[in-house]
Swiss-Prot record:
Protein name: Translation initiation factor IF-2
Bias (Basic and acidic residues) ranges: 195-206
Record organism: Paenarthrobacter aurescens (strain TC1)
Composition-biased stretches (Pro residues): 75-95, 228-241
Alphabetized UniProt keyword annotations: Cytoplasm, GTP-binding, Initiation factor, Nucleotide-binding, Protein biosynthesis
Amino acid sequence: MAKVRVHELAKELGITSKDAVTKLQELGEFVRSASSTIEAPVVKKLRDAYPGAGAAKAAAPAAAPKAPAASRPAAPAPGPAAPKAPAPAPAAPAPAAPAAAAPAAAAPAAPAPAAPAAPAASTPVSAKPGARPAPKAETPAPARQGGQAPRPGGPRPGNNPFATSQGMPRGRGGDGDRPPRPGNNPFAPSQGMPRGERRNDGERPGGPRPAAGAGGPRPAAGTGGPRPGAPRPGAPRPGAPRPAGGPGAGNRPTPGMMPNRTERPAPGGAGRPGGAGRPGGGPGRPGGAPGAGTGGGAPAGGGFGKGGRGRGGTQGAFGKGGAGRGKQRKSKRAKRQELEQMSAPSLGGVSVPRGDGETIIRLRRGSSITDFAEKIDANPASLVTVLFHLGEMATATQSLDEDTFGLLGAELGYKLQVVSPEDEERELLDQFDINIQDELDAEGDDVLEARAPVVTVMGHVDHGKTRLLDAIRNSNVVAGEHGGITQHIGAYQISHVHEGKARDITFIDTPGHEAFTAMRARGAKVTDIAILVVAADDGVMPQTVEALNHAQAANVPIVVAVNKIDKEGANPDKVKGQLTEYGLVPEEYGGDTMFVEVSARQNLNIDELIDAVLLTADAALDLRANPDKDARGIAIEANLDKGRGAVATVLVQSGTLAVGDTIVAGTAHGRVRAMFDENGEALDVALPSRPVQVLGLSNVPRAGDTFLVTPDERTARQIAEKREAADRNAALAKRRKRISLEDFDQAVAEGKIDTLNLILKGDVSGAVEALEDALLKIDVGDDDVQLRVIHRGVGAITQNDVNLATVDNAIIIGFNVKPAERVAELADREGVDMRFYSVIYAAIDDIEMALKGMLKPEYEEVQLGTAEVREVFRSSKFGNIAGSIVRTGIIRRNSKARVSRDGKVIGDNLTVETLKRFKDDATEVRTDFECGIGLGSFNDINEGDIIETFEMREKPRS
């Protein structure tokens, strides 16, 4: 026995395939889909789960063989019809008349338009209630039986794949609520199911069917067809009062509305209507009704010319009535699909949703086309195609920059906004119910306590910032800086007695070299007060102005320290005058900026400078913070210590940081294992405004990353991972090289673009960041060469760095770090170039020279000599030979040449293929010597022409 599929069994039981699959899964059977096959025991188990459905199904087939058409009427005998008679009470008057007189009875009962049109034959057929009388039921019964046999006229109901699914459902509709029989046209506009249901509802009992059959199987089918049924809601056709007009098919205008189908005309009541030829088919073919009453049905339907056509398009019957239109009419589904396709804009052969030009789409940095597609509910592949037609090439998962998204958004009518890093960080923390700003706003005065001011020392390189801090701290940091310039951010806290009270002050030292712009900006961001150091002998310099702009942008009060007043040529008044141009007016000039003249070398006026800082803090700032909460702050600097691992210098801005707290700083996370102050002494807690070194992080955070204490390690890890993914995507988008379609073929042909790959390793993260920014700003004036930093990190050069450099053919730059001995041997063996620097500008100069060396050589034309043609010799073997005399320079064989005549070039980019002195071959011929010159296939040579030879020489790059 063949295995049964789930959907076949579902049809047999009268349930949906989905219900069957669900039920089987509930019963513990593994079923993947409705097309799965199941064994006999499983079939039995499902049948047992639906005993009622199985019984109903069994009963239906039993009744079907007797009379498919009659089964619908449900009352071939008067007995069954009697109980149903009360339901169609309104139709009772019409059926009371005998079959022959049915037309007369139908006329008064049926609607005005239908009554006159209904013929005698159609009357008994269409009237459901009218068919109920026992005598009528008996009369139609034989007709139906006879009709079943002669059904050769057309395919069985339901077998026609082009039918609109009326045939089969109608034949069985009277049996009970059963799904449409197999064979329904899946492309029909969904009339099949409703029809079957209508026959089963109360308004179309099976009783009337027999009566209808009496008049003729086909008419009965037509009349009893689910389509014209009275229950049809919203159908403004005469078919609505069906009960009364049952006896006469003419009462059913639906058939009349059916479209013309010349292939099956049914004249009079002969073929379909009158003849019992289609009893069973009647139900499935509403069109049969009109045919039954040839003349009657058609006029009732609105008088279409070809009355009696048994079959008509279902939409003509149920939709807008009218003859000859159903054949071309499309289903609602098809129309809807066409409308959607028409409304969807197309670009490059794909349809994508468009905005109205004002729709704002927010994307994170480094988003891909897939992310954008999710926002606008589009197919990523379609957006890739659109971008391709706009001249940009990208994959669906490739991180794109803001310009590319702007181009795509403008084309599709969207305004794309790339979320700023600050907003991105805020949205990320919101996912973990952390909102730092709300925490600060919710704090009242009762929980705030005074904290130390954070002071940043800024200024131009070599103006004495670090020496000034040495004087304040009584230490000697300058001696430890390479090249005498600061390349790190240092943070220290001192205690100073001010007005008889000990006050703590936190100092942050920033680099002054131009490469450390990011560090200076970071220092201004975290500070309360800025000390602007200006050398009295140099005056205002570029980095002085930049530091001033950073401080003013951060809205930070500024105290000016005029340093080196002990030096010859010092002119503090000149400095004051210069700074006045930038909005810093000294108090003695009527302004509000405090100027203090100091000498860091001689320790002059250091206390006065500290007092000025504290006075400014007390007057202009509210320096308070809440120490009784989880710590929040910023990582000022970080490095990888060989013995202690990742070490981060953090500044606590609010709350209290304690040993054992779980923190996350940028992409690093971990538990605080130990804390140290600037002197290397261990601390247990760090209060607001306290800089400390933290041990225990998973990796080295970047300088400037915010840090916060989290409830548990899991939260810290998740925040760090999300930050890392966002940073990686942003870096990929930034690194992406945009190549237009116009340049793509050329780039491929030329081996694309020369790239210098670098791996940067440094001792602290801030220095590595500054070095990377400075290197990426190098411009050699040619887009054919680009610089790419494929990896950067903090700590010594490792074996993994060498392996990466080997694969990507990269150069390793070590900044204040060295490789281990084994790593150096591996690099030598693999041929990896490693460079080591301790001063940043030396690294910048070397990389710039390397980039210039990678540039494609530029060539210039250098003239070798000229020759005048005296005579032309014709040769069948070599072509025309120019007998010439060399006027200037040298004529060389295989050199490039051009021919000029009367000052006009007539042949260019030629080659001197043959060069002879008389009959001997020559390599070169000098001035005032005669020679024979052959230019290959170029034969347009006349006497008096000038042959000029030249070569292309490489032009040195400046």
